Amino acid sequence: MLQTAAIMLVFLLAALRVHAQGNPFTQPTESELRVAIATMRADSRFPPKARIITTSLAEPSKKMWYDSSRRGTMPREIKATIFDASSGHVYEFTADVRSRSISEVKHISNAQPLLTKADYDSSEAIIRRWPRFNDAMKKLGISPADVSVETWASGIPSAPSQRMVRAIFYIKHANGVNRYDRPIEGMSALIDLTSRSVKEWREVPRPEVPNATATYMLPSKPEPPVKSGLPTPTMVNGEVQWNSWRFTPMIHAREGLTLYDIRFVEKGVARRIAWRISLSEMLVPYGDTAITWIWRNAFDVGEYGFGHSSAQLRKGADVPENTLLRSASFVDDDGTVVTKKDVLAVYERDAGIGYRHAASATNVSSRHARELVVQHAAAIANYDYIVSYIFALDGTITVDVGLTGLMLVKGASDTVYDEVGNSGQMYAHFVAPNVLAPTHQHFFSFRLDMDVDDTANVVTEMDLRSPPSGRENRYGNAIMTDEWDIRSEREGVRDVSVPLARTWRVRSKRTSAHGIPSAYTLVPGATALPFLSPQNYVRKRAQFIEHQLFVTRFSPSELYAAGAYPNQSEEGKGLPQYMENDDRLIRRDVVLWYTMGVNHLARPEDWPIMPTAHASFKLVPTGFFERNPIMETQGEMKKR
């Protein structure tokens, strides 16, 4: 017995490895996740047949982390969303992996968590057993075995006690390549996973099935790595340390790549910039009016999960040879811990001229620039999204989303382009014979928990304008800046203005020797306005697309722009709830929610696989430094 107990103790201590006084933001390990799930299942409140939907680090208290004297006492906790299919109940369990104890249990009412592999498998099994599906395929001369079933979130607010999904169908390819080019157009099913039944079947009289499109796949072997001559970045206990930058990246099951405790070291002091930055939510509304398309509006973060959809990144193909790759562990429905290999990439790359000036032909001062890229890719059904945070030597952070993969297309009778845009080409674009790509939009809501030098910040809106002719603009060339502080959450609902070159500055009470406030400026990038009508139920569920900026007061539980459970949600969740109290924002801990958008009007060049398109915005130091910080970085200043 004693020997067994000793072995168990050794195993437990080895398994935990839980950062006694280290970095609390590091990715949960396989061992920690196993301990957390075992602890939860041992609790009497854990439903016997419940599924694990997501697990994540229960983040440490911001106040405790900023108080360095208390860091050693912080718990290491794992939070899990639990779904009991037998009752339809949702729970949130939090377990302390050091003490192997349950810290908190919450019952979440009227909610449906994001979809998982078990839901996809159940959906396919239900529809394949349904006689009408099999009969419909046989009428088309298609063997049901040759049909691929694609499961979507239902796209509608519905009774939260019933777990609903949609199914659409494609013809399989013999080699498994590009199944999305042969949709069985006009057929779809609404499936109740709770009762395991088909609730609605849509079938047009003569579904269109396009012929196969030429394969897009190249040989899967990566190209030989090209030597960049740049070093591979390093991590110290999970923290990236590159030149003056310090931060910790983590892959969340839901949000994907999330950055913690972002700082810039100046004169030996690691100055705060942001506590947490992540992709909070997405919406992809499709503009086709066909009955099998009107519900296709994907909340990709909250309905499917960016982390669960992580794709492996390969040197020589996705990232350069000098990349530092890291894996991430997640938990499947049944509690099995699964590690996804090489899903986080960190690499340095050339960034061109950092600065340059030629005082004369023989007196040129210049510095070459580099930048650090932190990257994650999510393959969600047909689309691939690449989220990158790019850190520059001048203190700028660029947030970039790459959009690639395969377009979602529909089968059609059209064999040529219709210049007038009749029939199906009113709402979709001809990309190949019998293949139309519906017009759609992509909205990305980023949550930016800014802590510029302190947790007490002020957000200022900055506009440029040309004053009327007169004393202020006698010669017609004047450009003035208007600034006003956002005082409350309701005032913090703001829009991009191109005529006013609008930006937003987050400043602290710290000032330079000359009285300039220390600040970072949000410089907007890709912008799109929603084409969904104001009465559309999806638009009402996605209030974050109504404006480009929302400013709220920090609350650790307010993480998701469309709410914690957008699947089958009703209107008014997320940001509308967070702003209900209209909290004051002057000298408070503020969070910026910035939404950028992309309009996708399909081109033939987007088919059969899309070249990567990019949408981005920037966080730019504005008075944070007293002079150009590139001058202080490592590297030789070249003169001639």
Each language-model region and where it sits:
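Extended effector regions of multi-domain proteins
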Residues: 21, 98-102, 106-115, 138, ...
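Bacterial N-terminal signal peptides
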Residues: 5-17
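Exposed beta-strand-loop-beta-strand "reactive/processing" segments of non-cytosolic proteins
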Residues: 47-98, 144-192, 374
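A generic structural signal for short, solvent-exposed coil/turn residues
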Residues: 12, 47-49, 72, 141, ...
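Short, non-transmembrane alpha-helical segments in secretory-pathway proteins
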Residues: 25-66, 115-155
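Structured, charged N-terminal subsegments at the starts of enzyme catalytic cores
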Residues: 83, 92-94, 134, 145-149, ...
